[in-house]
């Protein structure tokens, strides 16, 4: 079983809060989210817990990353600085990226990198659909953040 949440879900729904983190101030403490993921896994029996981590610089500019707890190990994605065109669909794109990477047989680190890259790219597109190709996601996840159109 897999749990996908954002940095506020565990606190708002289950009362599990990350230590030394101020979501509204854009402060994310990785150690605190390790504890949140472990508590969710222990309490509900999840094998994997994925948590997106948004750090607000402004309403339109954020730092975006995520962590994946998988069988007692923790994996953190790289952090992207992104200008937001539309947030709608960003979480769905993260979940879709996580599922796609799992179905492709990716290892946990590559899985979380792929999911975050898919979501990051979606934030740059207006509307609810992520209109990027799997190749574009792979390139960004693999380190190509040049922003050059690859079509």
Report each predicted region and the residues it spans.
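Conserved post-catalytic alpha-helical subdomain immediately downstream of the catalytic base
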Residues: 74-144
């Amino acid at each position: 079983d897999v749990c996908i949440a954002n940095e506020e879900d565990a606190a708002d729904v289950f009362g599990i809060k990350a230590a030394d983190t101020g979501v509204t101030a854009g402060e994310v403490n990785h150690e605190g989210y390790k504890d949140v993921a472990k508590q969710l896994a222990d309490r509900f029996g999840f094998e994997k817990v994925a948590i997106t981590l948004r750090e607000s610089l402004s309403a339109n500019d954020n730092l975006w990353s995520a962590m994946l707890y998988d069988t007692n190990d923790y994996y953190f994605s790289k952090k992207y600085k992104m200008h937001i065109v539309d947030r709608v669909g960003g979480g769905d794109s993260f979940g879709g990226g996580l599922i796609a990477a799992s179905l492709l047989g990716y290892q946990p680190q590559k899985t979380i990198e792929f999911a975050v890259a898919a979501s990051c790219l979606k934030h740059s597109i207006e509307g609810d659909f992520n209109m990027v190709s799997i190749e574009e996601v792979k390139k960004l996840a693999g380190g190509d953040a040049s922003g050059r159109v690859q079509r």
